[in-house]
């Protein structure tokens, strides 16, 4: 390994070890447990997977929590913590019974009360959860292991919602923790999942440690996407934050780490050429990028100026800057994912700088700076901000491109303050396509504004009416027609701009086997030689 790279890697490990008082050499010498050392796409600071849609929090959630239902590789919803369930003849009452042996990491049994409190909290934050709660009359405990969900009218997305595979996943927490206000981070990291969170070794943004949960009782079925048995085959998993990807790549090649969640695409040829390194596409559905404007702050509180922005940008520019390799990118302006039942290009804008300039004038743009937040430590998102800045400058907008780390962006995007008080105008993010397949699950289409909408707080009553219609419709052809109308309206009012679809594979050590296809990078079933 290059001396500078080795020094950088050792410095990262020393920083990660310093808080717990163990230098990396001593820690490695004493390490007897089978440990996977992984570099994830971002450091973990927010440990609550309900208050944020950030994928690092979702990934953390899959480590320590479990779910009532889960989606399998055939996109069918399967029981997970639930042993059995029934639906009344009028389709208004769902009855759920929990499996035997479910236990939280503090030793307490999982009860109906825990599940009810967790669903209520999730239902205040998540797009699909909010919609489910709109049609829910009550959630009631029958006994410690059985509870009911009663509806106002038949609603076909009950199990789909409870088995939602990605942000926000309806993870089950102890009742006392789930009663935390839905806009506050939970005070404890206690679940019933296959790993336990090692709080004493947690260094926010730097290092997270998980250990195998010896009390976890897996299901008997084979693992399939988010469903089935979650059998842990190692003792510990450590997430290390190594922001310099050259350092991380060299550490993987030299066997000092085992796993990189999101290696930059321009490093893939190097990794493929390295002896034994595996490039694993765990998410075959792929990922979609998103440009999100803030509807609360000028100038994007004006529809004409939002429309101008959509006409200024070009999706291919984003894909070229972000991915660059045609084998890993798919131009796609379908908001509900290309090559799916709801895919359509209806309403999609075509770049038109002259028209964008005219709309900017009609909208009364006053030349004030537009704050674009750019996460410099997240390779998959870092190139997007400069592309947007260049496009907006071409039509005459004054752009303030502000660099920060991803976790700072995740915190700041929740602020509804004016720009001069720490607010913002634009940020970019990305979603696994499992989150984007329909108008109910796609949070970019949530048009509730300040009353439960996604960051940017887009508000449109017409879209909300159509989302309700989609949720109640069971005919796939009619659902597709509604999705088409939703997309046309979403583009017309400037909900967001899709920056393209792509594949983001893992890079892993030859020592690891058993990596599963899943909606998130999961660590059960993985063995280390």
Residue positions per predicted region:
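Surface-exposed binding/hinge segments that line
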Residues: 30-31, 97, 131-203
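N-terminal lobe/hinge region of extracytoplasmic solute-binding protein
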Residues: 39-89, 120, 190
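Periplasmic-binding protein-like
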Residues: 48, 296, 300-339, 383-384, ...
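Aromatic- and charge-enriched surface segment that lines or borders ligand/interaction sites
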Residues: 83-128, 142, 146-150, 251, ...
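Aromatic-rich, solvent-exposed beta-strand/loop patch
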Residues: 90, 105, 150-170, 190-244, ...
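Structural transition elements
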Residues: 195, 326-362, 376-383
């Amino acid at each position: 390994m290059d001396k500078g790279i080795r020094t950088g890697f050792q410095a990262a490990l020393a920083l990660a070890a310093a808080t717990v008082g163990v230098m990396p050499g001593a820690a490695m010498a004493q390490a007897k447990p089978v440990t996977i050392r992984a570099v994830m796409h971002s450091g973990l600071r927010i440990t609550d997977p309900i208050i944020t849609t950030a994928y690092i929090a979702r990934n953390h959630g899959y480590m320590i929590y479990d779910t009532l239902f889960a989606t399998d590789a055939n996109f069918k919803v399967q029981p997970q913590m639930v042993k059995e369930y029934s639906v009344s003849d009028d389709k208004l009452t769902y009855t759920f019974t929990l499996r035997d042996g479910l236990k939280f990491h503090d030793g307490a049994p999982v009860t109906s009360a825990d599940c009810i409190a967790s669903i209520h909290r999730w239902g205040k934050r998540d797009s699909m959860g909010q919609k489910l709660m709109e049609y829910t009359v009550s959630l009631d405990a029958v006994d410690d292991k059985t509870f009911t969900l009663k509806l106002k009218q038949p609603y076909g997305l009950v199990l789909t919602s409870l088995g939602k595979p990605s942000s926000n996943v309806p993870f089950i927490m102890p009742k006392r923790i789930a009663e935390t206000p839905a806009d506050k981070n939970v005070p404890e990291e206690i679940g019933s999942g296959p790993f336990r969170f090692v709080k004493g070794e947690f260094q926010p943004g730097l290092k997270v440690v998980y250990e195998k949960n010896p009390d976890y009782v897996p299901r008997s079925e084979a693992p399939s996407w988010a469903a089935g048995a979650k059998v842990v085959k190692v003792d510990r998993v450590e997430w290390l934050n190594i922001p310099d990807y050259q350092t991380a790549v060299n550490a993987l090649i030299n066997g000092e780490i085992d796993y990189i969640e999101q290696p930059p695409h321009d490093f893939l040829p190097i990794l493929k050429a390295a002896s034994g390194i595996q490039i694993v596409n765990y998410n075959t559905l792929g990922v979609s990028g998103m440009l999100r404007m803030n509807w609360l702050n000028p100038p994007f509180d004006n529809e004409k100026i939002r429309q101008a922005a959509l006409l200024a940008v070009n999706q291919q520019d984003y894909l070229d800057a972000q991915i660059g390799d045609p084998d890993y990118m798919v131009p796609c302006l379908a908001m509900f994912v290309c090559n799916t039942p709801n895919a359509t290009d209806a309403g999609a804008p075509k770049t038109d700088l002259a028209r964008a300039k005219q709309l900017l004038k009609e909208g009364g743009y006053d030349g004030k700076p537009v704050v674009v937040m750019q996460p410099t430590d997240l390779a998959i998102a870092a190139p997007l901000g400069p592309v947007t800045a260049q496009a907006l400058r071409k039509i005459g907008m004054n752009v303030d491109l502000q660099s920060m780390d991803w976790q700072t962006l995740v915190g700041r995007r929740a602020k509804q303050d004016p720009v001069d008080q720490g607010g913002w105008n634009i940020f970019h993010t990305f979603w696994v396509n499992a989150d984007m397949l329909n108008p109910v699950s796609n949070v970019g289409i949530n048009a509730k504004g300040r009353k439960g909408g996604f960051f940017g707080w887009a508000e449109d009553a017409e879209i909300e009416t159509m989302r309700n219609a989609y949720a109640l419709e069971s005919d796939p052809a009619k659902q597709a027609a509604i999705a088409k109308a939703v997309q046309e309206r979403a583009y017309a009012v400037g909900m967001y701009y899709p920056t393209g679809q792509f594949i983001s594979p893992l890079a892993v050590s030859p020592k690891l086997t058993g990596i599963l296809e899943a909606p998130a990078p999961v660590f059960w079933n993985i063995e280390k030689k």
